[in-house]
């Protein structure tokens, strides 16, 4: 395990200049936070497996970072980069044009972005045998990173620590959260673990697939014939999962997506009110002339690595960080990450969420109204399957309306919460809730972390 702090006390007015000019400043610099405090490094989590993390200290004008929570953000895919997409496209201090983000979560929490699993973003492996193959391996790697992080950053050991996530990142967050709880109980990791937040998360893949047809039909994006076609392949996915044929289920999942694209004129799986690019539909028609896994990866990781973001990460950001190996590029191993998780992809983790709830860990589920790939109907379906004894009381509650702007009468979300389970329905948002509804996402984060 290797971890060394990378920081340099540079006057803030100088910090943005080299990056905006696309120049190499020479020394590692700490922009763009108000306090100008960032650290980043690699941790060797296994032989030939190196995980990259990037920490921003909170920049609240009224509170010290030690008075605010620490949020770790996990991206989806698997193979999507937290330090890239989550940081510059969703919740970090700057957007992908390097302009300040008004809704950055940094104003209410310190942010820890981790490129996970190994091979994602700036994380990398040396040798094909070092990729993670399943959730257990992903969680084990993260325990090595978190043990190292909290040992070296003792100032965060007592700060409330939350794991926020998106998409497949939610599945990883559940598994990581449970292993972290166990590690804390054993005394091998010292931190103040406060909860997990599962955003549009791949907790029960088959429940998502089964809900696609009814959801699209209710939104006038399928008619009777199309609904029948989608429902037929969804049943095939269910049968494969029930038989434990998870590789086959993953392939059938890809087939279901192709049928949906053909019947909806290329609906966008991440926001049904926006259109997929024409190349997306064209590529889907060619899917089974290539490896179905490679095609699925192109569809579900490509949007997290668009050209502009890739150029930013492999250009100015790489120069800023100064520790990326010369033979590694941001996102260069993403396809291999996705392919190596094939067997694990369609496995549900409802039982893990149950274990978290039974352990008293705060669990928040939040979902965008316009998401298709992990639609709200599917999320509600797996929540109803929880064996948590308090679920009936949770279900009987009436939800409460939320407003991102207290001066507005427009409803931004609904929430239902009982004991250590909460569910947020985020309106007018797709799969990437912070990107679509930044104000409401920030408000939700504050509510989850008990700041409102």
Curated annotation (Swiss-Prot):
Enzyme Commission number, as recorded: 3.4.16.-
Keyword Glycoprotein: yes
Bilayer-spanning residue ranges: none
Compartments, as annotated in UniProt: Secreted
Entry annotation: catalytic residues: 167, 371, 431
Gene Ontology, cellular component aspect: extracellular exosome
InterPro entries the record matches: AB_hydrolase_fold (IPR029058), Peptidase_S10 (IPR001563), Ser_caboxypep_ser_AS (IPR018202)
GO molecular function, one term: serine-type carboxypeptidase activity
Enzyme class name: hydrolase
Residues carrying covalently attached carbohydrate according to the record: 64, 126, 362
Keywords recorded for this protein, A-Z: Carboxypeptidase, Glycoprotein, Hydrolase, Protease, Secreted, Signal
Keyword Lyase part of the UniProt annotation: no
Signal peptide: 1-26
GO process annotations (BP): blood vessel diameter maintenance; negative regulation of blood pressure; proteolysis; retinoic acid metabolic process
PANTHER family cross-referenced by the UniProt entry: RETINOID-INDUCIBLE SERINE CARBOXYPEPTIDASE (PTHR11802:SF3), SERINE PROTEASE FAMILY S10 SERINE CARBOXYPEPTIDASE (PTHR11802)
Homology family: Belongs to the peptidase S10 family.
Protein task: May be involved in vascular wall and kidney homeostasis.
Protein name per the record: Retinoid-inducible serine carboxypeptidase
Species, as recorded: Homo sapiens (Human)
